[in-house]
Amino acid sequence: ITVNDFPSNDLQFDAPIVDHQQLEKILATPQTFDTSAMINGDELAYVLFTSGTTGSPKGVEVSHDNFMTFVDWMLSDEFKIKEHANFLGQPPYSFDLSNMYWLPALLPGGTIKALPHEVVENFGQMFTALPNLDLEVFVGTPSFADMLMLSPAFNQQKMPSLKTFLFCGEELTVKTAKGLHQRFPDAKIFNTYGPTETTVAVSEIEITPEIIENNDRLPVGYAKPGVKLSIWNGDQEITTPGEQGEIVISGNSVARGYMNNPEKTAKSFFKIDGVPAYRTGDAGTLDSDGLLHHKGRMDFQIKLHGYRIELDEVRASLEKSPLIKQAVAVPKYNKDGKVTHLIAYVIPNESTEDTAGLTKQIRESLDGLIMPYMMPTQFVYRES
């Protein structure tokens, strides 16, 4: 479905295009619906795959009830999203952050201004397109916002209708939040937190200039209705405010488990007093008033451009190449503590001085065997 807002005639689509006029005609046509196959709330709504340590991603089963409690929360007064708003639709549908814009936009009569991959990959075209989209709600990762701030035109003067920023998927740094407040002084910036296993996000907080001024790392918010956030040390809940441990999430946002994987489901999903709960593997603290602070991972998992990645899965995927004897993946961090890219340290099956050629061959040999966002951007070769 298109609203013909992109200033280009070169975009190619391999699917039928329905414009606004055609859509109105379709919706005005009476339809007969079969109500004999009703959907129950605990039935499967969608499956999203996340990284796994063995090289086999885990399929997270999210129910209709899970999803609707999230959407109802997004449309509540907490986020103050108005009806008929224009949402930026940049995160792909394979990324659960996309659920933060498609139903929250469409249910109250809003419009999704989707950025095709070709536009995102072409900075000049993207920077030209954005000020012409009349955007009101930004949904994306902090990394994407950092990219947009490379353009001088990404500011309140050029985009006066953009009043709401919704972030999830990776850490929102003080630097990014401060830059956005300088560019969009009248906008509201919301930081949210939640793994795929708990349906997109389970906590939120509006990041004000005062919060930026008083924190080295920004908090990730208070629990949504129907959810309890707690901090655990092993199998014991920590009740002392400010003490660090593993973040455990319980309540109506917790997914059904991992598809066809009862062993991993039993390891991460459990019940607290009969209520579904999930061990996140994230380290965190809770203030006395329930404000959650995320302190990073407790294992070898990272966030890269919003995607959750098991470093051991990257290793296992790399070692599927017949050119690699042994490999290890190492994240590269910037001064703000965010992962910028992955470095692969590789022992090749055969020594060569043409490392650039070997890297090209390895990439080609892994085509279809590793997700593009998991492919290291730098390869370093060792003899042992």
Predicted regions and their residues:
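AMP-dependent adenylate-forming
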Residues: 1-37, 67, 138, 188-191, ...
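ATP-dependent adenylate-forming carboxylate-activation enzymes
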Residues: 5-7, 110-133, 139-147, 171-172, ...
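Conserved pre-ATP/AMP-binding loop-to-beta segment of ANL
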Residues: 31-49, 56, 81-87, 93
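Conserved AMP-binding
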Residues: 44, 91-95, 118, 143, ...
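Conserved S/T- and glycine-rich ATP-binding loop of Class I adenylate-forming
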Residues: 44, 50-53, 87, 93, ...
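Short, well-ordered beta-strand segments
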Residues: 45, 61, 68, 86-88, ...
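Conserved AMP-binding/adenylation subdomain of ANL enzymes
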Residues: 58-88, 96-136
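Gly/Ser/Thr-rich phosphate-binding loop
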Residues: 107-110, 135-139, 149-219, 228, ...
